[in-house]
């Protein structure tokens, strides 16, 4: 997932150098107000990042992704994703991925249009954090 034009350019350069294509999702910040410790672009800037990805050789615009804010109502938090997805699809109609929701909030994510969910904890159980 990508939330800054600088990352789009760097990923595009690396993909060209490797002779590969890379599918990128626009990471949407659902925190209100925005939490600087968490990634993502505000919903109003999604199209700008989508256009940057679409313009970059070797990058494929795939759609959007988001994680619900900590402690927020997931159904309410995920509500902006469908309009964000429409903004991305205005840039590239094939960019239909909405990646949102994890084991604890997948129903709310699917209810708001998620096409991909991350359910590692539901499948594998709780795991200890990776400490380096």
Q: In which residue ranges do the predicted regions lie?
A:
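Active-site loop ensemble at the mouth of alpha/beta enzyme cores that anchors a bound cofactor
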Residues: 116, 129-132
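Conserved alpha/beta-domain cores
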Residues: 1-104, 110-112, 121-126
């Amino acid at each position: 997932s990508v939330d800054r034009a600088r990352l789009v350019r760097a990923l595009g350069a690396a993909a060209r150098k490797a002779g590969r294509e890379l599918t990128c999702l626009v990471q949407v910040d659902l925190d209100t107000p925005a939490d600087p410790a968490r990634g993502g672009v505000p919903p109003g800037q999604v199209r700008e990042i989508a256009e940057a990805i679409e313009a970059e050789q070797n990058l494929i615009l795939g759609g959007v992704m988001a994680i619900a804010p900590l402690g927020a109502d997931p159904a309410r938090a995920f509500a902006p994703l469908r309009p964000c997805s429409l903004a991305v699809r205005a840039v590239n109609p094939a960019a239909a991925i909405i990646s949102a929701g994890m084991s604890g909030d997948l129903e709310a994510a699917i209810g708001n249009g998620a096409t991909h969910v991350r359910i590692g904890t539901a499948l594998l159980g709780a795991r200890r954090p990776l400490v380096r």
